[in-house]
Swiss-Prot record:
The gene is Zftraf1. A zinc finger (TRAF-type) spans 152-210. It holds the Pfam family Sina_RING. One of its GO terms (cellular component) is perinuclear region of cytoplasm. Interacts with LGALS3. This is Zinc finger TRAF-type-containing protein 1. The lineage of its organism: Eukaryota, Metazoa, Chordata, Craniata, Vertebrata.
């Protein structure tokens, strides 16, 4: 199996970059201690006092907003962030977690990191996903990867993890999607899976066909009144036959995937869909990845929301569809199977679906096919993110 061959042409460095105060986790080199990060966090905790980290953050955001070489979207987002930071400093108040957000966020995507946090030699922070994308883009362009903030060189040997920031981020509060209460980010997953009284659960009689889904605190009442335990054997056999058919389809899918994994030519890569707008009078949102190389060919992925309907914002049901485009020339038809799965740093739920297409110079793009997201809630999670990070698998079928 070939290794991950990642996208070129812009990379995360081209996305909006917010400045992060260099006092947080700054070290003289990869081996530097993370003590300054803890000191900055302690200073930021002072109630009602505009700390140096917040002031420095506001100044650097203003500089990023005024940078004439920065992309327009980056300048706009940096200007908005600078206004918010300046307002927080002027007020000298606000919740600690809100003030720390701009200090601890990734300098590339401006989101709080979900996993590992890396820092350049000047202390600018990058989440694991953006860090990997910067390195991959530079490799494909045959350039030295640089920090999007200070332009110092970055690599796996020059950058180090910042454990102080990782631990600080894990303690910041985050809202439960079911009960809307706040918990430390490190405890939120366990709460949502095991403890939340409003989490969605299933009836214990689902094995004999009960379709009920509901909040956990209603489970006992439902199970006491559930009609499925009293059904006759003939009624249950009909339900079990339907469940067996569904199980057979699922097994057929996984057997097909295992068969594809035995192919000689297999490629995979992490892809990053970025949002764009059409030039129409009423603009429409669409997504596109930078060019990337897999199986020695150049490709691009595009995606659209609700099949580009006129007003997807008025629909309660949200879907994404995508197409794969071959950008390089081929001397013979290229028959491939492909599928998209969630990326290594995201938690979106996607059901694997295998698609098949024969690429030629005349027919070099697939039709739009559904991105098999579990439901509209998962789709909204993707749409709410600044970028959509997925993993593409390509299997070349040889005659």
């Amino acid at each position: 199996m070939s290794g991950a061959e990642e996208a070129g042409g812009g990379g995360p460095a081209a996305g909006p970059a917010g400045a992060v105060p260099a006092g947080v986790g700054v070290g003289a080199g990869p081996g530097a201690a993370a003590g300054p990060a803890a000191a900055a966090l302690g200073e930021a905790a002072g109630p009602g006092i505009p700390d140096e980290a917040a002031l420095a953050g506001a100044r650097q955001l203003q500089e990023a907003a005024g940078d004439p070489d920065a992309p327009p979207k980056k300048r706009l987002r940096a200007a908005e962030a600078a206004e918010a930071a300046a307002a927080a400093v002027a007020a000298g108040s606000g919740k600690l977690e809100e003030r720390l957000y701009s200090v601890l966020c990734c300098t590339v995507c401006l989101d709080l990191p979900k996993a590992s946090v890396y820092q350049c030699t000047n202390g600018h922070l990058m989440c694991a996903g953006c860090f990997i994308h910067l390195l991959a883009d530079a490799r494909l362009k045959e350039e030295q990867a640089t920090c999007p903030n200070c332009r110092c060189e970055i690599s796996k040997s020059l950058c180090c993890r910042n454990l102080a920031v990782e631990k600080a981020v894990s303690e910041l509060p985050s809202e439960c999607g079911f009960c809307l209460r706040q918990f430390p980010r490190s405890l939120l997953e366990r709460h949502q899976k095991e403890e939340c009284q409003d989490r969605v659960t299933q009836c214990k009689y689902k094995r004999i066909g009960c379709p009920w889904h509901g909040p956990f605190h209603e489970l006992t009442v439902h199970e006491a009144a559930c009609a499925h335990p009293t059904k006759t054997g003939n009624e249950l056999m009909e339900i079990l036959d339907e469940m067996d058919q569904s199980h057979r389809k699922e097994m057929q899918l996984y057997n097909s995937i295992f068969s594809l994994l035995s192919f000689e030519k297999i490629g995979y890569t992490e892809v990053q869909f970025r949002p764009y707008r059409t030039d129409d009078f009423i603009t429409r949102l669409y997504y596109e990845t930078p060019r990337f190389t897999v199986l020695n060919q150049t490709w691009v992925l595009k995606a659209r929301v609700n099949d580009s309907e006129r007003n997807p914002n008025l629909s309660c049901k949200r879907t994404l569809s995508f197409q794969l485009l071959l950008k390089s020339k081929v001397t013979a038809p290229l028959e491939c199977s492909f599928l998209l799965l969630k990326g290594p740093y995201d938690d979106v739920r996607i059901s694997p679906v295998i698609y098949h297409f024969v690429f030629t110079n005349e027919s070099n793009e697939t039709d739009y096919v559904p991105l098999p997201i579990i439901d509209s809630v998962e789709c909204n999670k993707l749409l709410a993110a600044k970028n959509i990070n997925l993993r593409l698998f390509l299997f070349q079928i040889q005659k």
